[in-house]
């Protein structure tokens, strides 16, 4: 009797924090694909919009496992604090490097238009005609997101309103996942799931379903008034956050961010998203402003978005430089798993899977080990800031065990 092939489905996420919409997505992903295991690739302690996570990656891993995920792997920092395109590429590369993932599921606002958007984004990013047109928009002073929306409208004939609606974070990431799969020549399927409830940036509920599926943005805003005000999270996830006992903000990291910007002022342009114009702004404003919020607002310009400013600051701190894209993930760090999870068939994978750092870091060498050191440094900075803010003992990456649930 032929042995049935194990079905593994991937999700790329941040869980900042984990909410009911995330639990719904995991359940739908399992249902749509018939998955034996759902594997999550999750940001570490800093997220794609250039901010810190509200709580560390171990707590968020526990939330995800309690919410239905079977395995959680860490997305390396060099991808996690990059553009949507690089974030998506890193996530897909991680799943592909496991050698056993059949499909990637993601939430989006318009599943029916993801293929069209992916083709058009490919054109504007990788074909000469599209690249030249985008340069023309940039010369007119348009930011990259605004230029891409204009390009989308011209190529599809959609109305300005429809294009604006389609340029939502879930749709953009979905299109980028498609492109990453194409770039890697992967056979992984894309399975878009319609986003339910609040929009990505929405803070105030407007319809009944919004109360059930609140956005992470809304939950973070609720947290301003304490845990008692938080709605929209599974009880187990909220309890894990309460037990952690803290919620971090990016301004908590301002002293170390400001120090990095000053110390590295002569080599700012070597970092990934720091153009000569942005480097000049950083060098000027770091001498004039005294707090994080004032600094990022002073650095935002007509054609440089706030998200890019915030990402660039973190890239300076963690020394993330512009490099050729990897075609293999040099390592994958497993943050946690369920006890009863279906074993992953990793026989086709050439990527070392690292569990406990103290035991397995030595499996890497050279530049691969340096890349892992970058992730460890990011975690150390986060743990240090938590300890300074709360008085809690500082976590040590080398003493952290995998999170096991179930």
Each predicted region: which residue ranges?
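N-terminal catalytic cores of NTP/NDP-binding nucleotidyl/phosphoryl-transfer enzymes
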Residues: 1-60
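Class I S-adenosyl-L-methionine
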Residues: 30, 61-65, 179-182, 220
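Non-catalytic positions within long, well-ordered alpha-helices that form the structural scaffold/packing
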Residues: 30-31, 65, 92, 96-97
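Receiver (REC) domain switch/active-site residues of two-component response regulators
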Residues: 36, 70, 102
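Acidic, Ser/Thr-rich peripheral helices and adjacent loops at domain boundaries
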Residues: 59-61, 345-346
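A glycine-rich helix N-cap at a beta->alpha junction
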Residues: 61-76
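Active-site cores that bind ATP or allylic diphosphates and position pyrophosphate for catalysis
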Residues: 74-406
């Amino acid at each position: 009797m032929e042995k049935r092939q194990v079905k593994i489905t991937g999700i790329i996420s941040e869980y900042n924090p984990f909410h009911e919409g995330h639990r719904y997505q995991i359940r739908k992903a399992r249902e749509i694909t018939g998955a034996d295991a759902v594997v999550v690739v999750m940001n570490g302690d800093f997220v794609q919009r250039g901010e810190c996570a509200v709580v560390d990656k171990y707590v968020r891993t526990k939330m995800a496992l309690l919410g239905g995920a079977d395995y959680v792997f860490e997305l390396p920092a060099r991808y996690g604090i990059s553009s949507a395109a690089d974030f998506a590429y890193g996530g897909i590369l991680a799943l592909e490097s496991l050698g056993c993932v059949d499909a990637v599921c993601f939430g989006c606002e318009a599943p029916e238009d993801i293929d069209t958007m992916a083709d058009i984004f490919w054109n504007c990013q990788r074909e000469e005609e599209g690249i030249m047109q985008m340069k023309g928009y940039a010369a007119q002073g348009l930011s990259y997101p605004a230029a891409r929306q204009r390009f989308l409208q011209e190529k599809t004939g959609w109305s300005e309103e429809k294009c604006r609606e389609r340029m939502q974070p879930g749709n953009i990431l979905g299109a980028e996942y498609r492109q990453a799969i194409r770039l890697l020549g992967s056979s992984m399927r894309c399975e878009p799931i319609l986003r339910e409830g609040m929009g990505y940036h929405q803070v105030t509920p407007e319809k009944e379903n919004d109360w059930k599926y609140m956005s992470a943005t809304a939950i973070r805003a609720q947290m301003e008034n304490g845990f008692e005000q938080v709605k929209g999270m599974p009880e187990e996830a909220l309890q894990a956050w309460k037990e952690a006992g803290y919620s971090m903000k990016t301004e908590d990291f301002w002293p170390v961010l400001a120090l990095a910007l000053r110390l590295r002022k002569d080599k700012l342009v070597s970092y990934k998203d720091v153009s000569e114009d942005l480097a000049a702004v950083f060098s000027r404003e770091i001498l004039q402003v005294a707090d994080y919020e004032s600094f990022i607002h002073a650095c935002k310009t007509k054609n440089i978005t706030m998200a890019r400013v915030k990402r660039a600051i973190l890239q300076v701190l963690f020394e993330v430089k512009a490099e050729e894209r990897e075609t293999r993930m040099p390592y994958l760090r497993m943050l946690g798993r369920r006890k009863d999870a279906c074993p992953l068939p990793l026989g086709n994978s050439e990527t070392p899977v690292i569990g406990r750092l103290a035991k397995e870091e030595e499996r890497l060498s050279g530049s691969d080990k340096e890349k892992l050191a970058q992730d460890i440094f990011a975690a150390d900075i986060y743990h240090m800031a938590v300890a300074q803010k709360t008085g809690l003992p500082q976590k040590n990456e080398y003493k952290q065990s995998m999170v096991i649930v179930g």
